[in-house]
Amino acid sequence: YNAISAILRGYGDSRRPMYFVAMSCLLNIAGDIIFVKYLGLGVAGTALATVLSQSISMICSIVYLNRKKFIFTFTLKNLRIDRDRLKELAMVGIPISSQECMVRLSFLYLTSVTNRLGVNAAAAVGIASKYDVFAMLPATSIASALAAITAQNYGAGKPERARRSLTAGIGFAVLASSVFFLWAQLSPQTMIGLFNTNPDIIEAGIPFFQSCSFDYLAVSFVFCLNGFMNGRSKTVFTMVSCCFGALALRMPLIWLAYTYCPDNLFVIGLIAPAVSGFMAVYTMLFVIRQLRQDNSGRRKELTLRSV
């Protein structure tokens, strides 16, 4: 299901994966209604609806691509493990998976810490985490697109297009995330009020929203830069960077803030953007260094050709 969408995106087609995912979502909703509401299957019905919807979407996508004569044919005979390709995928995929795990781990630690600060603080941080998903969605999506675009253009010998895509991607991600950032700065109480109207929770959450919302802008740089580096197969760097940010910076700083400023949610919320900003700076420096090496290598190649 996800592999077919990834293949299509790598091929430069992001529209058809969207159609397949939309089909899965609609089938999932219909399945939830049928299995839970009418058949009374409860949680098992929800799980069944998810599995069936994704399976049907996968089968339909395979049939569609085979009929459209895609670049290769999906058959049972072709579904086998190629050791060389598996090694290449593992070298790229495992570091990317590891960096995602580290990011989730640091957010889980933040949740566990804020749960000890009382009901109001825990509720406010929980509401903020819901907005985080939507506020960071543009950066996450653009980072995935940048990885594919960068790989395609470097493979085609057009690095300049990849660099322009990076600049455009960062600009678009920052612009899209700015909507949530400005909302959190100008009217955080309305953001919290959409989920909970308790005045104590709103009061506790306002300083946290105003500080943590800076992370929406910072991660736009980090995610896009990491996507660019992933497209160049520099996945080990992005993995080490994310592990360092989560284990050496974010989690220890959260512990320090909890230990010495337990009642100050503004300080706790400021940790994420501070760490992301620092990561953005050294990642940007690494990218600039890589680009300079590319230019130097290209100049040497042109010099050798002219001799």
Language-model segment annotations:
Residues 1-9, 17-25, 46-59, 140-143, ...:
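Short runs within selected transmembrane alpha-helices of multi-pass transporters and secretion channels
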Residues 3-7, 26-34, 62, 108, ...:
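Alpha-helical transmembrane segments of multipass membrane proteins
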Residues 24-25, 58, 96-104, 108, ...:
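Hydrophobic alpha-helical transmembrane segments in multi-pass membrane proteins
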Residues 14-16, 42-43, 120-121, 235-236, ...:
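Membrane-helix interface segments
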Residues 34-41, 101-129, 134, 152-153, ...:
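Helix-terminus/linker motif at the lipid-water interface of multi-pass membrane proteins
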Residues 27-30, 38-94, 150-215, 257-307:
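Short alpha-helical transmembrane segments in multi-pass integral membrane proteins
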